[in-house]
Amino acid sequence: MDPNCSCATDGSCSCAGSCKCKQCKCTSCKKSCCSCCPVGCAKCSQGCICKEASDKCSCCA
């Protein structure tokens, strides 16, 4: 699997627990690789969903 977990916006992806991608914009991605999450957001691994056109996500807002 692509370690960068790249996919189209609003697409689906299955990021591994060790995923460290920074460009993942998948709505289905529930790992800390959501690009809208700040580094060190402890809640991101608990179900982060990036909001469209936003620099924050549902768990880090």
Swiss-Prot record:
Name of one Pfam family that matches: Metallothio
List of residues binding a divalent metal cation 7: C50, C57, C59, C60
Binding residue positions for a divalent metal cation 6: C37, C41, C44, C60
Chain residue ranges for the region called Beta: 1-29
Stretches for region Alpha: 30-61
GO biological process: one example: cellular response to cadmium ion
Keyword Membrane applies: no
Highest rank taxon of the organism: Eukaryota
List of residues binding a divalent metal cation 1: C5, C7, C21, C24
Binding-site positions, a divalent metal cation 5: C34, C36, C37, C50
Binding site for a divalent metal cation 2: C7, C13, C15, C26
InterPro entries: Metalthion_dom_sf, Metalthion_dom_sf_vert, Metalthion_vert, Metalthion_vert_metal_BS
Residues at which a divalent metal cation 3 binds: C15, C19, C24, C29
Modified residues (N-acetylmethionine): M1
Residues annotated with Phosphoserine modification: S58
Domains (record comment): Class I metallothioneins contain 2 metal-binding domains: four divalent ions are chelated within cluster A of the alpha domain and are coordinated via cysteinyl thiolate bridges to 11 cysteine ligands. Cluster B, the corresponding region within the beta domain, can ligate three divalent ions to 9 cysteines.
Reported function: Metallothioneins have a high content of cysteine residues that bind various heavy metals; these proteins are transcriptionally regulated by both heavy metals and glucocorticoids.
The family this protein is said to belong to: Belongs to the metallothionein superfamily. Type 1 family.
Name listed for the protein in its UniProt record: Metallothionein-2
Lineage start: Eukaryota, Metazoa, Chordata, Craniata, Vertebrata
Gene designation per UniProt: Mt2
